[in-house]
From Swiss-Prot:
GO cellular component: cytoplasm
Disulfide-bond pairs as recorded: none
Name of the molecule in the record: Trigger factor
Subcellular location: Cytoplasm
Chief location of this protein within or outside the cell: cytoplasm
Family designation: Belongs to the FKBP-type PPIase family. Tig subfamily.
């Protein structure tokens, strides 16, 4: 810090500090004079040749504006220097006010939101339930059957449509004899049992044959998204064109090769599937206990969050949702109108995330936790196993500093969870593979 800069601080609250900064006016005057001389070289004033305007005229016409520019520059150049000199962990941009020339100093006040100094409560009182699961033979068989279903084909079937069959049909809907928008389609495909349509629709088609026509009566749910249809009784004329049954692929060499199995047959596929499921269990269990631990800690720690921090988190979550939209609908995230996603939509989750970030940072600081590089290497290696060329992925995460920093942040957060679990009480509960993965999916959707 420049030795001629004077700074005093006044802590307004746990999340805000005010600095009074004094800069010697001589520093400003020197810069003002320098700029006036620069302006004089090119200034054009009637009655004088370019470069020959008297300095008194330059000061009279440009002096006030130049002085204000210099003051703004000096404030911009010194405010962060002042914040740093006081070891203040600022959040967001400082708010400058009360700027004045006083005696031999430029004096201004900078109000800045600060990272809250939270005394984390309840670390030794945490009680969480840690879910665990095992992969049995039936789970592996079910997963392989799901792999088959992902590549299922439908072949024509003679007879009535039953659960699992795919039906191709035309339909025409009406309410009180009047057609309505979106109520008709041709060559519509529906798998019986998929619950894709409103209640009663599939039941009306089940049992029909190709070439058969009939009218079914259904009632739109009260909470149906189209308000003009909610709770209304409707009639649909159905014309079935084709009934097909599912045909799963045989587990032969061609099928095995789809999953990278060239040797070892079905047993090798089962072994690969089991290992992948065990990785999923490990990740899901880790995610579950982390969520439970953080939830328990948040219940015991409520505090105000700096507005800038909350706004940053809201914007981060909004951008994440827009990215999901772009992936889902195949559009550029920039094409979505942000006004469709108001702050209120994210405030609750953003406040939780901001508080959690502060708590985690305080635990790291107070307990002196440092990232375990061996765990970082293990994390990268395990993540790379999911790719066709693990070595390429490992090299990417090893050489890209930003990506490695992201992983280090995740690993350090895991270390915080480990520390918290060691201080608290954990009870293990075994659940099924399906329940554990379903809970993880619900957790991710809520984020």
């Amino acid at each position: 810090m420049a030795t001629d800069l004077q700074v005093t601080t006044n802590k307004l609250s746990n999340k805000e500090t005010q600095l009074t900064v004094k800069v010697p006016v001589e520093k400003i005057q020197n810069k003002v004079e320098g700029r006036i001389r620069q302006v004089a070289k090119t200034a054009k004033i009637d009655g004088f040749r370019k470069g020959n305007v008297p300095m008194s005229h330059i000061r009279s016409q440009y002096g006030a504006g130049i002085q204000q520019e210099v003051i703004n520059d000096v404030i911009r150049d010194t405010v962060f220097e002042a914040i740093k000199s006081e070891d203040i962990r600022a959040v967001g941009m400082p708010n400058i006010d009360d700027v004045k020339l006083e005696d031999d100093f430029l004096v201004y006040q900078a109000t800045v939101e600060i990272f809250p100094e939270v005394d984390v409560q309840g670390i030794n009182e945490i009680e969480v339930e840690r879910h665990t699961a095992k992969v049995d033979e039936a789970d592996v068989d079910t997963m392989i059957e799901n792999l088959q279903k992902q590549r299922e084909e439908f072949v024509e079937k003679k007879g009535k449509a039953d659960k699992g069959n795919q039906v191709t049909f035309d339909f025409e809907g009406s309410i009180d004899g009047e057609k309505f928008e979106g109520g008709s389609a041709e060559d519509f495909k529906l798998v019986i049992g998929s619950n894709q349509m409103i209640p009663g629709f599939e039941a009306g088609i089940k049992g029909m044959k190709a070439g058969e026509e009939k009218t079914i009566d259904v009632t739109f749910p009260e909470d149906y998204q189209a308000e003009n249809l909610a709770g209304k009784e409707a009639q649909f004329k159905i014309n079935v064109k084709l009934v097909e049954k599912s045909k799963l692929p045989e587990i032969d060499d061609a099928f095995l090769e789809l999953f990278g199995v060239k040797e070892g047959g079905v047993e090798k596929l089962k072994d690969d599937v089991r290992k992948n499921m065990e990785r999923e269990i490990k990740n899901a269990a880790r995610s579950q206990v982390k969520q439970a631990t953080f939830d328990a800690l948040l219940e015991k720690n409520e505090f105000d969050v700096p507005n800038a921090m909350l706004e940053q988190e809201i914007e981060r979550q909004r951008n994440m949702m827009m990215q999901r939209f772009s992936q889902q609908f195949g559009a550029n995230a920039d094409s979505f109108d942000k006004d469709m996603l108001p702050n209120e939509l994210f405030e609750e989750q953003a406040l939780r995330a901001a508080r959690l970030g502060i708590i985690v940072a305080r635990v790291i600081d107070t307990k002196g936790l440092e990232v375990d590089q061996a765990r970082v290497e293990t994390f990268i290696k395990e993540a790379a196993e999911n790719y066709e060329d693990p070595s390429e992925v490992i090299e990417y995460y090893t050489t890209d500093k930003q990506q490695r920093a992201n992983i280090e942040s995740v690993v350090l957060e895991d270390q915080v969870v480990d520390y918290l679990i060691e201080q608290g009480k954990v009870t293990d509960k075994e659940v099924s593979y399906q329940d554990l993965l379903a809970a993880q999916q619900q957790q991710q959707q809520a984020m």
